[in-house]
């Protein structure tokens, strides 16, 4: 329905507003259903869906766009999402169902909101672990957003591919990002089931995966040939997926259940910052130097800072008091 770039911008902004609570609400649901020792796989699969979409979408959406145009493609995507929303509303239930409670009076709701801001948000913002988790996850999302937003353009420029060819080829490594998300959660659960504390298992996994992702990203700055580049991208996005899964799960392990959504909201603010800076800085550097090499080097450095934050930034205790 839009007819200008300005309207597209505002429509995309509204889409972002609608998407913002999804990860927070979904994480809260998984915390309800799964214990700390088994929630890694569930959250990994949940986070992995965000990578599976970009992997599956290009071949289908490009075909639809080629046949019917981008407007019909957008309508189809919207209809599918509305159907999924209806299915969720109809079938989802909390693990423990009871009688419907009476509506909360307005003054009680306002008091609860003030209490939550003071007791939860204020408390969490004063804690070192909150800032370490947020800073670390900013780097995680910076690297993942770099590949989501610029991978097709990078392949198009360096390998002299058409837009459609680059879009299709970029979908292949994204599948490994999904596998990394799921395997990262599964790996955490396996380590926890061997007697290692879930928080320790999560931190170890995110540190190692981010270290691998940062080093592999720096290697891409050397501009290897097409086949080595695709192989490197496959391993890089797998490691990135592991880090995304573990970094998000970490927030559910350092706070009590009633504070999970608040902490994840704080962490998600850092993630949004990383998601904005990655395409912006990459575009600036690629334009300035005529190459993606400097952008990959910067991303490598940001990834290494994230590793330090996860390894050294935590105080060693949870925020469950």
PLM features per residue range, with description:
Residues 11-50:
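Cytoplasmic helix-loop-helix junction between adjacent transmembrane helices
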Residues 199-247:
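C-terminal transmembrane helical hairpin of 12-TM major facilitator-type secondary transporters
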Residues 6-14, 228-235:
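Paired small-residue
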Residues 99-134:
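Juxtamembrane intracellular "pre-TM" segments in multi-pass secondary transporters
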């Amino acid at each position: 329905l839009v007819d200008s770039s300005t309207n597209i911008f505002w429509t995309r902004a509204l889409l972002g507003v609608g998407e913002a609570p999804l990860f927070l609400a979904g994480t809260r649901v998984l915390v309800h259903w799964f214990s700390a020792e088994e929630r890694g796989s569930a959250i990994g699969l949940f986070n992995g869906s965000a990578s599976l979409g970009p992997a599956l979408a290009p071949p289908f959406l490009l075909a639809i766009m080629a046949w019917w145009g981008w407007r019909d493609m957008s309508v189809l995507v919207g209809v599918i999402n509305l159907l999924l929303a209806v299915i969720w509303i109809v079938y989802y239930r909390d693990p423990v169902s009871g009688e419907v409670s009476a509506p909360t009076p307005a003054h009680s709701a306002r008091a609860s909101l003030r209490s939550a801001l003071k007791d939860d948000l204020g408390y969490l913002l004063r804690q070192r672990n909150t800032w370490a988790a947020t800073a670390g996850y900013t780097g995680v999302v910076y690297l993942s957003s770099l590949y989501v937003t610029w991978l097709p353009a990078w392949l198009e420029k360096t390998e002299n591919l058409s837009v459609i060819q680059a879009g299709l080829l970029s979908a292949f490594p994204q599948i490994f990002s999904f596998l990394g998300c799921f395997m990262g959660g599964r790996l955490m659960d396996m380590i926890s089931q061997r007697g290692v504390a879930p928080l320790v298992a999560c931190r170890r996994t995110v540190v190692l995966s981010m270290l691998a992702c940062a080093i592999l990203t720096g290697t891409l700055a050397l501009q290897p040939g097409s086949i080595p580049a695709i192989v490197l991208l496959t391993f890089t996005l797998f490691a990135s997926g592991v880090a995304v899964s573990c970094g998000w799960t970490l927030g559910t392990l350092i706070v009590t259940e009633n504070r999970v959504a608040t902490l994840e909201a704080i962490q998600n603010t850092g993630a949004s910052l990383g998601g904005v800076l990655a395409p912006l800085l990459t575009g600036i550097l690629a334009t300035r130097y005529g190459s993606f090499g400097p952008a990959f080097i910067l991303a490598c450095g940001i990834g290494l800072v994230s590793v330090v934050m996860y390894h050294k930034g935590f105080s060693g205790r949870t925020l469950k008091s």
